Amino acid sequence: MNFYSGDYDIIVAGAGHAGVEAALASARMGKKTLCLCLNLDSVALCACNPAIGGTSKGHLVREIDALGGEMGLAADETFIQMRMLNLGKGAAVHSLRAQIDKNRYHMRMKQVLESEPNLTLRQDECAEIIEKNGKIAGVVCSGGTEYSCRAVIICTGVYLRSLIHIGEQSVEQGPSGLARSNSLSSSLKELGFNLRRFKTGTPPRVSRNSLDFTKMEEQFGDVPIPHFSFLTEEQKKEQQCCYLTYTNAETHRIILDNLERSPMFSGKIHASPTRYCPSIEDKLVRFPNKDRHQLFIEPEGNRTNEMYVQGFSTSLPRDVQQLSLRTLPGFENCEIMRYGYAIEYDCIDPTALALTLGAKDIPGLFFAGQLNGSSGYEEAAAQGLLAGINAALYVSEEPPLILRRSDAYIGVLADDLSTKGTNEPYRMMTSRAEYRLLLRQDNADLRLTELGRRTGLISDERYARLMRKKEEIAAAKRALEATVPPTETLNLLLASRNESPVITGVRLGTLLKRKNICYTDLLELCPDLPPLSDEAREQIEIDAHYGGYIEKQNEHIRRFENQENILLPPDFDYESINGLRLEARQKLTAMRPANLGQASRISGVSPADIAVLMIKLKQNGQNTAYSENETVAEDKKI
């Protein structure tokens, strides 16, 4: 028998990385929020790798921070090693990665949730979504507790009817031995959502005391220590070392000899696996000519002996895991503390969602995280933040926050999922962002913090800090307009940097465009130049070195911006439009894109179809441009 237990503005189902950001955004925007969690000991659980960030994922964390989210601050407080990746490549792909103490990370996030004034955290299972008159009205929990609300955000991760596989054994449970959610899938089906089965996995954890690190390569953290949050000051702490080792022919022999015992290859698992984080057995089958695969050995925290074997995700039987691991250099006597496993779970087709991550057919229902078909903590947190903001704006009857592909990686993520969908766990990559030179991790605050300010997630103090940084950059750019004569001192400096000499006066800004010249070099020449913070100096140098490419991308955005501004009504009758191909009519009717730009990215919709749509819209004489009050992000320009 159900019993009524309270009314909330917004209810968040799940307290993983998506649920945490969604609940905090909702509460901080003034909405009375309830966050339901299957187990309070699993808040922000790092069930797989003990790390935040990485290639493209670090960009997402910086954007979450710039909009007022929590992940970056939590990673900065709980890291045990920080490394900037891809420094040998261009600035667009520089990505920060933190090895974190996963238990401290969980506790830190739980404390933040518990301390938020408008937020109630409760251990219970959301089992049913209540819909009345076509709108969200509340939820019912598995024990019969009923809550009313105006919006629900589903962030259940990999827990919906999850199934763990280790060799021939299959167990109905969630990650790390936690309980799974059994009822919500049925409720989602009744609401009309198409559910699929996806699969991911995790490697074994081994005891630090059983490893011989002298046979492995050391991987040290960066000094000075970088940070994710734009609020974090300079950090000084002793960092832990990670290690690198490799598989070998014997490792491969043992795994391949037991391939039929892997549920992925025995036919036991039919769910779609992740392409970009394959199991070790999948790697050996897909890349048979590769002699070895690298493995990173990573500590899971400061107060545990558990070491994470990155690159060795597996669902092989326990005995095969033990035998194959002991063939690795330094692992001859290794002891497994937790076995690797595969997990399959229910997820929705994300093309049922709008760019806000709200359901197209049910106002007030939002989805975020792995339930949407994505993979990764950072992708989940980014979706959680976006869904939380838009749920709060929905409850307030305010325009939504729509991040475009030219605004943020979060915009690319939302657009890819809602427009293209995915047939396998979706992972963010820099190659997915066509404007990645503009969407660098270093300028996330300059791109997004003013948007966060408008949603109410950015404090006065933080906004003032951003304004000071902008003025610092502007003052430096004005100073770089000055011209210096071709003195001996200048040419000696250029020679020392392997740059050609000058014979006439030259602008300081022009000098800075040279590959080997940095702002500190110019300070030596012109002591009157304003000194800059590291963050401002980085912006000045990147703008100088990549200025031509940046302008080309901005011009590309300006050319295509018109399509993004042309709205398509949600009830637009595509079937009645003569000239649209049958496939285009079917795809557009099913997807109901928000604008012409989104329509153009749907598989099966051709440029000719877009031209037909543009003509039809003009004939209808409808207002096709975003107005100032139709999207929070509209007057934001890069």
Which stretches of residues belong to each language-model region?
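Conserved N-terminal/central alpha/beta ligand/cofactor-binding core
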Residues: 7, 24-128, 143, 155-172, ...
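Internal hydrophobic alpha-helix adjacent to the cofactor/substrate pocket in enzyme cavities
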Residues: 380-401
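Extended, charge-enriched "interface" segments that sit outside catalytic cores
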Residues: 432, 449-611, 615-631, 636-638
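An anion/pyrophosphate-binding glycine-rich loop and adjacent beta-alpha core
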Residues: 39-41, 185-322, 330, 410, ...
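A glycine-rich dinucleotide-binding beta-alpha-beta segment and adjacent secondary-structure elements
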Residues: 308-374, 402-415, 533-587, 592
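Conserved beta-strand-loop-beta-strand element in the redox core of flavoprotein oxidoreductases
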Residues: 130-146
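Short hydrophobic core segments
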Residues: 13, 146-157
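Beta1/beta-strand and adjacent pyrophosphate-binding region of the FAD-binding site
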Residues: 4-18
